[in-house]
């Protein structure tokens, strides 16, 4: 999976596993739900003109490994706390996907679950250190959580309907 920005196809993406086919169309297209897997960098697009024709892109990639796997326990705990707060405010439910999650995957779990800006998620994907990803997410969620709490209070005052 890769996204496109104003400059074209970004060079860092990730492999994806299809977890669910939501809908099949008569022309063969499908609405699917996927889970990102291994990050990669595109080294060469073999058919870059295919994108303009809405066709499948093909290319050569290098799979990316993290530079380091150590994380700071305090940063990790704060990220989990902020994730729980934001998830609960957005989805009105406690996140159940934290149990048994490895520390080296926490940033990807948080970024994939919360409705963050797509280009912001791209920045997280491009970082090659779990510690860096966790620090970046903590900074973002620290700023975002108060806005979510403010929106929640406004919804509660409006009777939960969002209509005044």
Per-region residue spans from a language model:
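N-terminal low-complexity, acidic/polar interaction/targeting segments
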Residues: 4-164
